[in-house]
Structures are given as structure tokens and as C-alpha cells.
Amino acid sequence: MTSMTATNAQPFTIVNVPEMRRVQRIHFVGIGGAGMAGIAEVLLNQGYQISGSDIAENANTERLRCLGATVVLGHMANNIEGASVVVVSSAIKADNAELVAAHQLRVPVVRRAEMLAELMRFRHGIAVAGTHGKTTTTSLVASIFAEAGRDPTFVIGGLLNSAGSNARLGNSKYLIAEADESDASFLHLQPMVAIVTNIEADHMDTYEGDFNKLLDTYVEFLHNLPFYGLAVMCVDDPVVSDLIPRLGRQTMTYGFSEAADVRAIDYKQTASESCFTILRKGLKPLDVCLNLPGKHNVLNALAAVAVATDEGINDEAIKSALNKFEGIGRRFQHYGNFAISDKDSNKEPGEVMLVDDYGHHPSEVAATIQAAREGWPERRLVMAFQPHRYSRTRDLYEDFVNVLSQVDVLLMLEVYSAGETPVSGADSRSLCRSIRQRGQIDPVYVATVDDMPEVLESVLAPGDLLLTQGAGNIGALAKRIATEVLSHES
């Protein structure tokens, strides 16, 4: 296990932002969100009074409460009384009672990314941007830096299993964080190092449906780097590669491509482990094994290795951190193998492998399917999928049809709206019809998450790999399946 408490960290005096001396209590509207909770935890550990509200309890709210934060359920105007500043995410609507009250009381209101930018202002910021892979890449950078004794502060969009949290206040100069392009709020950040993993059309409502506006915003983000900063770019992604001539900043590239400055060769996946050799200019080849499956995770690791190499971290720390990496919650999270008997035959009892994954964009789903196929080619792949947002389903409809047709058995939940109004023809029944017309598989529509365990009992057979996939409330399904459907671990 990579310890997140380093004993030989570089000397660094943690100071609160001097101009924030007037701030005593910081209130978070929607404190249970991963990004919000992470920043709240760092500020709490810096000595600020933290309060917050959300509409439901989750692991983040429970953890923050245990750490000393005041967390209440429900958004009410009186929740912000006594707050010096109110922090909101882009998910909070303008008519939110607490937001309205803050404006009436002239309490400063800042976006989540603005507060993250303040934390980064007096540190060596490493920001990870891109459509996919941000959480895993950020986690890998943090793990390598911790293994090397650099004791970083980090704010991650998922639970880093080795730390038991998605955030930590370190004692060094380093702050490692995700940079969120979904609402263009990453423009607030001014890091020393920026990683761009890939760029695809997603969250296009923010960019008025104009892909060029999305690209221009990425360039603007990278121009926030100082002239002595570093842009770490995935050369395997053609869109990212095409941006490099526009940057006017020092760059380091990574990928499987021969053109990459940090390159992977001789890749081989065995179950959940990916082994490969890293080539870097002027350095000896480095043979590593990453405790994550799939080529997409190799790319994430290469980005982390590029940053670590630039910071002078030794190869032994890099190799050790990748090998011991314990993963992130809901990123190809392996729940285990569970005993199951075949109810419809006289076959011997077998087992089902259960994996949960957060991926909800067609490219992410495709990468997860590929990793499952390469690691466990003999298993029948059963996917329980929940589309996320009607707008994404509408905009990427044919891509979803193509990728979801690649599994052996598909159980489809209704679209998780995330507050959006339903869009005609972009619902799960429509997706099922379109997939069925392809003639490859016959998807099963499942109305609610509560109905899924019963459906699975009738579908699963010994030897299956069950993959629960999506970003909505399907996230709680894997644990429930493990206890209600697959109760005996083998």
C-alpha cells in the first residue's frame, strides 16, 4: 500500500492564503459532491470552520462530519448564517435558497474552481484536464509523489483507496488536482504543470455546441501556465496533438506513439494487471507493472510518469507506486468473485466476477469493455448500464448504440437525468430498440435500480463477468448485488 503520509517530504510551510485572514467559516452548497467535499476537507485541515448542506447523505458527508464539519440535509436560507463565504458548484441553480440568501446578505459567493485556485495560488500546482481519465491520472500522480516522499496535497474526483479519501492536506509545496472543463471553470486555475489526457465532444451545452470553442478554452487554460511551466500532452489523441503548436509553452508528450517523449512499448494485460516498458529520452528503459487493466490506464500512468520524471522522482518510486496502486472507487472496481449455481441446468456451481465502473461516455464504456475482454476473454460479459443525462444520450446516441452492442448481455436502466428534462428519442427504451435492430444482442429494459437484482438473478450464469456501468444512482448497485444476489464470495 502506498502510504499517503511521507516522512521525508521536502520542507514547506503550509500557510493559509494571507488575503483569506478575514474568512472564518466557509459554507459549501452541495458539500457531498466529490469535488466539493475534497476542497472542504483540505480547508478543514487548514483550520477553517466548514459547514455545508446537501440533499442526501453519502460517504463524503459522513466523513466530513466526523472530521468536524457541520453538515445539514436540505438547502435552507438560514444554513448560511454566519458564513464568511459561500462555495457553490455548477450544479447549484440560481434560485437555490442558500444562494439567494447569500446574495441578499452580501456574502461572497465563489465557484468551486475559484476556491481550488486559491488553494493552488501559493503551491506548485499540477492540474489534470481532459474528457476522460482525470480522476485516475490525478490519483496516479498523487500516489507516485507520495511514494517518493513528496507528501502532496491532493483533491480528486473519486475515492483514492490507499488514502481512504478523495482529498488530503500534505506538508509539501505540491497540490495535485483535477481541472474541470465541464463548465469551463478550469480557467480559474493557474498551475505550474498541466496534463491534458484527451479531448472529445462532451458537456457541449457549455460551449454552445461549438467544438472549436471547446478547443479554444483548452488553449486558454494551458496559457494560464507560466512561461516556465509545462504542458503534458497525450500525443496519441489527435485532437490534443493538434493543439500543441498553439500553446507557446514547453511541452512533454506521452503515449504509445513513436513520437512520444514518454512512450509505452511491449504492453501486456493479465487479468487486472498491465505490464509494459517505458521509454524516455536520455533515460534507461523502465519495466513496470500497473495494478490497473487496459491501455487507457497505461496512458494515464504515462502522464503521471512524465510529471514525476520532470520533477526528478526516481524510477524505483515510480515503479513501486504503479505496482502497489490500489485503485479508485468506481473505476473498474473489482468487488470479487461470488459463488453461483446454474438454476436451469445440472451444471456444477461456478462463480461470477463483479466489477463496477463510473464510465458514462461511449469512449469510456468502450475502454472498460476492452479491458474486460482482454483480461478475462473466456467470460461472458453481462453489463448493467445506466445512461447519464438526456443531452449526452441525444448528442452521442449512435456512439452509445455502437459500443453497447459489443457486450454479450445488456440490461439497460432508464437515463439518469441529473436534473435534465427528458428528451424525446433519447431515452433508454429508444436505445434498446436501436440496439436490438442491429441484431447482435437483445437488450433488456429495466425500469428502476430496485428492479435490477431480481432481473440479474434470472440472467446470471456461472463464469459471467458482471459489469455495473454508469455515473448515476447505479453507483450503489454493485454493493447491493454483492449482498442480495451474489451473497457467497468464493
From Swiss-Prot:
The keyword Cell division applies. ATP binds at G130, T131, H132, G133, K134, T135, T136. It catalyses: UDP-N-acetyl-alpha-D-muramate + L-alanine + ATP = UDP-N-acetyl-alpha-D-muramoyl-L-alanine + ADP + phosphate + H(+). Pathway: Cell wall biogenesis; peptidoglycan biosynthesis. The keyword Nucleotide-binding applies. Cell wall formation. Belongs to the MurCDEF family. This is UDP-N-acetylmuramate--L-alanine ligase.
